[in-house]
Amino acid sequence: MFNGAILVGAGERQGGDPFHAIHPATGEKGSVAFSSAMPDDVAEAAALADAAFDSFSTLAPDARATFLETVADQIVAIGDLLIETAMAESGLPRARLEGERGRTVGQLRLFASYVRLGDWLDATIDSAMPDRAPLPRADLRRVNHSVGPVAVFGASNFPLAFSVAGGDTASAFAAGSPVIVKGHSAHPGTGELVARAIQAAVKACGLHEGVFSYLPGNNRALGGALVADPRVKAVGFTGSRGGGVALMKIAAERAEPIPVYAEMSSINPVVLLPGALADRAAAMGTAFVGSLTMGSGQFCTNPGLVIALDGPDLDAFVAAAAEALSGAAPQVMLTPGIHDAYEKGVAALESAEGVTTIARGTEAEGCNRGKAAFFATDSATFGANPLLAEEVFGSSSVLIRCSSIDEVIATIAGLEGQLTATLQLTDADSADAARLLPVLSRKVGRILTNGWPTGVEVTHAMVHGGPFPSTADGRSTSVGTLAMMRFLRPVCYQDVPDALLPAALQAVSYTHLRAHETPE
């Protein structure tokens, strides 16, 4: 169960200004009063995380992997209470949340298997060359170390997979970093249940209590205090551009600046090339609406921009999309605030000069329902009005009608950084696609063809990141095993006796951990 507690290390406490979850499907206030963490809670959690760092960061890979698996087991053990709580607090349906729970525990287990493999250590040996002329070479050995305690901010749109035990937490644990989670106020009961599962896993594995703390709250000062604490060495964040940039500013102004790995804003352009439009315009129109309206459009990979050459084939796409979208029933949005922001964003597009409304979804019945919207404009209007390139979080998208492939390329070149870009194409479009790919690769973290961007697999190869403002640092990803690298840094050991080296660099570990050795 949950009781609205703050979880600092192995303990729990009440305190701070109380707040309640708002159930978006009904607008009702939840019955449990949740405590808001205070500055003293932040300081104690950071002190415990700092105290836990040495033992946790040097934990043997197998023991760390076992901890990740134990977290997964503890989450599964919560049972249906977790799903029912998340349904009430998020308005998301059961099937979606059951799938998200599977993704969350699967992600933890993937990191466990990767930790055991040891490749992430990147153990590298340049053996001594004492007889080299004119100067001998020292014995040099490099291995990755954890950066230190990590602050993680839970996201609103994935109460399980991008929240307390989501990808940021899983990858930080995998890297050997203690974690302090700032819980999201939209789903505090869900967050506390998962936090208690992690707390139980820490105890079951005999780890230092400071490996994990959970700080609920509904004010920005809490997050700012957490990022400003000198014992925190990195930040994982998924949320709005404004929130992410605010945390980046705090982190940059510290005496010791730290990285903020913030996933923020993306409209994920979809380019419909002429061959694809001639081949399957109507089918693409219907499929596009399915992607746009999935989960009320509350995905960071939602297809918020469509770019295509004007003409009869594009008209066929638009007709099919309009028909599908006109019958789309409004869905519950995650919070009243998100719904209000969506309505304001759609209203701004409806009133923008040079923008026409292609279609709207059916009328909403009940509170906090998002009515889907599809708009159209031309490339000149789009380029002249920055508002049209801003993310509207929800089932809203803008079509840009272009007169040439050069205009398509110029439009893409003018975009900000994005998480994804999609090319709908056939073999007949190869020449155009070849021209587009270099431009797209400068703008996005993931390029896909003949699909839709909303699904993000948790794998070794996945990149869920992109240039600013889609993320704070386009060299990283928040999904997949590569996400560990955000919380690791290389350390080189020169002429250090074997017995004093980290285990991965000792002679007994060479073959097991696949150390790389520079040839003479």
Protein language model features and the residues they cover:
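Short loop-to-beta-strand entry elements in the cores of soluble alpha/beta enzymes
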Residues: F67, A175-T190, V211, I258-P274, ...
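Structural signal for hydrophobic packing residues in well-ordered secondary-structure cores
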Residues: F53, S57, A72-G79, I83-A86, ...
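NAD(P)-dependent aldehyde/semialdehyde dehydrogenase
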Residues: T286, A308-L419
